[in-house]
Curated annotation (Swiss-Prot):
Function: Component of the RIX1 complex required for processing of ITS2 sequences from 35S pre-rRNA.
BP terms from Gene Ontology: DNA-templated DNA replication; rRNA processing
Locations listed in the record: Nucleus
Top-level division of the source organism's lineage: Eukaryota
Keyword Transferase attributed: no
Main location: nucleus
Name listed for the protein in its UniProt record: Pre-rRNA-processing protein IPI3
Keyword annotations of the record: Nucleus, Repeat, Ribosome biogenesis, rRNA processing, WD repeat
Family the UniProt entry places it in: Belongs to the WD repeat IPI3/WDR18 family.
Annotated source species: Scheffersomyces stipitis (strain ATCC 58785 / CBS 6054 / NBRC 10063 / NRRL Y-11545)
Length: 525
């Protein structure tokens, strides 16, 4: 099992070398590069990766073009260029609720993972404030909503697929039910049925919403939304109760946010290059009890951190090209032709991501640098190959080693890799015209013939692969005892007879030596 970090840059239309940039997928724990995608650049939040490994896809919205580039894992050049109704600024994918677990844990299934597979829905936001929703397996345009007045900066689905959340430059954040967005085959031909309202409209911010994140709860009642804005605020909402829980006020504008997988803290990237940790729990000094911070619409001002207990500083280090007192690490990261142009520009932490176990923080900035930091020590543990423009997306995913390594004999015919062309007009309401392109997987094994011992052994091996962070699979080999009880008894009897014989000989020898010793003493007397 390995964790792969995917990152991509925004690109610069004024830079002729911008098209030479690569989007990369690299391991967190070792130096292996899993995949690279040529001529890939996207607006902030304008790229999305369906997963890591053979059969997965990268979907990129072309900057300032009504075009969508689709890459296959293991191929550097795009497979498809799909025209769109208008240029998109952000993208989001979601798996179907009934197939999500099958896709993630296919090794435990009685069917093999199909070579052709696509997510369920693709959502995109545009500069005009519209939200588009496509069904990828058919290419049907299910919904177009005029959700905002200005550019949509970010769209995200909840992990369960129940809600779609969008943030915009108009300082609003809207929450939509996914079923409302895709309810086109309900048999009602009235156009007013499409004019539904959002599940929740958030208007608490005063400036543009730059980023948002949803937690991954075990039950939907614990679903929370974290939004950040250029008005220096981090706001936490309960989606089910539609209540604002806590507002954190910081000293700088916030550009990015990520939440701890266990809900212990939130990490925000600021416009001055700092990353602040905002703990959601603390220990009461009077009772020594762990208590939650905030709630009940509290407004909390985050104080400065002079001791740097909750602050990451590495993005603030700006090194000039002719500096001599710098480390080799930062020389490599800042070896660009436009160092002098960027010298007076502030450094923004544009994107944040967190590892599966919540121990490593991955961050990208406006200079194209990407770091992996240890959350406990707040020190940089790894750096990736820098890009020549601001980082627009960082995504972390996990997969087995054999899935990440693409072999030459695992290539699929191009026509079987392509997804359907995305429609530019709304689909009709006739359900009989709804056609899907799906691959029915073949059976991998018969679970009914598997006994408990084999199942337990397989689970033990899967647990070992999950905990193994290297590319070497090692385990202690157990040698079975193939001897029978009668053979063991005979072997023990032979050993006992040999020991008895040796003891008898040793005792007789001792008696002889004792007699000789007595004779010598008598002769001397």
């Amino acid at each position: 099992m390995d964790e792969s970090v995917f990152y991509i840059a925004e690109g610069d239309p004024n830079d002729k070398h911008s098209q030479e940039s690569f989007a990369l997928a690299t391991s967190i724990h070792n130096s292996q590069q899993h995949a690279s995608f040529r001529q890939a650049d996207a607006p902030k939040n304008g790229a999305i990766l369906s997963g890591s490994g053979q059969g997965e896809r990268l979907i990129v919205a072309a900057p300032n073009k009504a075009l969508l580039n689709v890459y296959s894992w293991g191929k550097e050049s795009p497979d498809q260029r799909i025209p769109l109704p208008e240029a998109l600024t952000c993208l989001a994918l979601v798996e179907h609720p009934n197939t999500r677990l099958f896709s993630e844990f296919h090794r435990n299934s009685e069917f093999k993972l199909p070579s052709y597979r696509v997510p369920w829905l693709l959502a995109g936001g545009s500069k005009s404030g519209k939200i588009y929703v496509w069904e990828l397996s058919s290419g049907s345009l299910l919904c177009v909503k005029e959700a905002h007045y200005q550019n949509v900066t970010v769209v995200k689905f909840s992990k369960c697929g129940t809600f779609l959340v969008a943030g915009s430059d108009d300082a609003r954040c809207t929450v939509w039910k996914t079923l409302d967005l895709i309810a086109v085959f309900d048999g009602d031909n009235d156009e007013s049925s499409r004019n539904f309202k959002p599940y929740l409209a958030i208007t608490d911010n005063t400036l543009a919403v730059t980023d948002l994140v949803l937690n991954e709860p075990g039950v939907i009642n614990d679903l929370k939304l974290y939004t950040v804005s250029r008005d220096n605020t981090l706001r936490i909402y309960d989606i089910i109760t539609k209540q604002l829980l806590t507002t954190f006020i910081l000293s700088e504008a916030i550009e990015s946010v990520v939440a701890d997988p266990a809900g212990r803290a939130v990490y925000v990237g600021l416009s001055n290059g700092l990353i602040r940790t905002i703990p959601l729990y603390n220990i009461n000094p009077n009772t020594s009890v762990l208590e939650s911070i905030g709630g009940n619409q509290k407004i909390i001002t985050v104080e400065s951190d002079p001791n740097l207990k909750f602050t990451f500083l590495h993005h603030q280090q700006r090194i000039s090209a002719d500096a001599n007192k710098t480390s080799i690490l930062h020389k490599n990261l800042n070896n660009k032709k436009n160092d002098t142009e960027n010298a007076n520009k502030p450094i923004h932490v544009t994107k944040l991501a967190i590892s599966l176990d919540g121990t490593n923080l991955i961050s990208g900035d406006s200079l194209g640098r990407v770091y992996v930091s240890d959350i406990v020590t707040r020190q940089v543990v790894k750096t990736f190959t820098p890009c020549n423009s601001p980082i627009s997306q960082i995504q972390v995913s996990s997969a087995p080693f054999e899935a990440l390594n693409v072999s030459s004999n695992s290539k699929v015919d191009k026509k079987h890799r392509l997804i359907p062309q995305l429609k530019r007009v709304l689909t009709g309401r006739d359900a009989t015209e709804h056609q899907l392109n799906l691959e029915i997987p073949s059976e991998s094994r018969d679970e009914s013939d598997e006994n408990f011992a084999v199942w337990l052994s397989r689970k033990t091996q899967e647990d070992l692969e999950f905990k193994n962070l290297s590319g070497v699979n090692s385990s202690v080999k157990k040698v079975a005892n193939i001897t029978s009880d009668s053979e063991s008894k005979k072997e023990l009897e032979d050993k006992l007879a040999k020991l008895s014989s040796a003891y008898t000989q040793l005792r007789s020898k001792h008696e002889e030596l004792l007699k000789e010793h007595s004779k010598v003493l008598n002769n001397k007397a």
